[in-house]
């Protein structure tokens, strides 16, 4: 069976969905074949790549990690990570989707699966993989065939209406990150409104306010990711967030 046939499906969403109805990790998931994989998605310009860089820098000396980025016709995000020395060049693969970023993380994930398999060949002992989606709309959401845990990044520059506009990314991501909170006063965005609406849209699904430029919120983000990994692997933690 080809990867195209294995990882191709079409979904139509009748509603934004609910946090407790989100896809869960597949029962037959083999973490020895592919390490625990985290998806980072969100609209264009919300700070996905900036956060991925900060996360990589925080974890790279403590864990064996690697990254796949998605762009439509360039490898801009991969080049950004390499230029800023988030990881060594061989640990970063840029995928050019050639079309809708949404499709590459859900409807047909084969390009990203190829890239992840290549990273596993290069680094058989890798512990944590990341897939950053290309910037897309609020309907974009990762397939659980591709990732085990999803982080959806929005920012305040789109206005405080964004959380209540919904979309599967906002309602069903494992973690919602509201970035660039320092810009709220410039665009008249009310953080209390965003907090209220995030709770309404996500129920008790976790969300947090963050600021990538100075790493505000990074400990919480990493804790959510590593806790999910530990739970999925049913293993005791073998690392800490901070160097001793």
From Swiss-Prot:
The molecular function terms of the Gene Ontology recorded here are: GTP binding; GTPase activity; nickel cation binding
A biological process (GO) annotation for this entry? urea catabolic process
Please name the InterPro entries in this protein's record.
CobW/HypB/UreG_nucleotide-bd, P-loop_NTPase, UreG
Report whether Chaperone shows up as a keyword of the record.
Answer: yes
Highest taxon, organism lineage: Bacteria
Per the record's keyword annotation, is Chloroplast included, yes or no? Answer: no
Compartments where found:
Cytoplasm
GO cellular component terms, A-Z: cytoplasm
The alphabetical list of record keywords is:
Chaperone, Cytoplasm, GTP-binding, Nickel insertion, Nucleotide-binding
Q: Which family does it belong to?
A: Belongs to the SIMIBI class G3E GTPase family. UreG subfamily.
Q: How does it assemble?
A: Homodimer. UreD, UreF and UreG form a complex that acts as a GTP-hydrolysis-dependent molecular chaperone, activating the urease apoprotein by helping to assemble the nickel containing metallocenter of UreC. The UreE protein probably delivers the nickel.
Which PANTHER family does the UniProt record give? UREASE ACCESSORY PROTEIN G
Q: What is the name attached to this protein's record?
A: Urease accessory protein UreG
Where does this protein come from, organism-wise?
Cytophaga hutchinsonii (strain ATCC 33406 / DSM 1761 / CIP 103989 / NBRC 15051 / NCIMB 9469 / D465)
């Amino acid at each position: 069976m080809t990867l195209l046939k294995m990882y191709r499906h079409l979904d139509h969403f009748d509603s934004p969905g609910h946090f407790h109805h989100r896809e869960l990790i597949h029962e037959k998931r083999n973490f020895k074949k592919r390490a625990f994989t985290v998806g980072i998605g969100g609209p264009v310009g919300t700070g996905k790549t900036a956060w991925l860089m900060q996360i990589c820098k925080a974890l790279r000396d403590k864990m064996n990690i690697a990254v796949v980025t998605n762009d439509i016709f360039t490898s801009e995000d991969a080049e950004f990570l390499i230029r800023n020395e988030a990881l060594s060049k061989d640990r970063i693969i840029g995928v050019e989707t050639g079309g809708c970023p949404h499709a590459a993380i859900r409807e047909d994930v084969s390009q990203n699966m190829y890239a992840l398999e290549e990273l596993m060949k290069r680094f058989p002992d890798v512990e944590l993989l990341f897939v950053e989606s290309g910037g897309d709309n609020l309907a974009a959401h990762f397939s659980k065939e591709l990732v085990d845990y999803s982080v959806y990044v929005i920012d305040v520059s789109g206005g405080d209406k964004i959380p209540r506009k919904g979309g599967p990314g906002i309602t069903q991501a494992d973690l919602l990150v509201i970035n660039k909170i320092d810009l709220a006063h410039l665009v008249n965005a009310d953080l209390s409104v965003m907090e209220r609406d995030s709770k309404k849209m996500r129920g008790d699904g976790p969300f947090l306010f963050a600021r990538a430029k100075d790493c505000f919120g990074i400990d919480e983000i990493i804790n959510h990711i590593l806790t999910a990994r530990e739970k999925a692997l049913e293993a005791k933690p073998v690392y800490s967030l901070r160097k001793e």
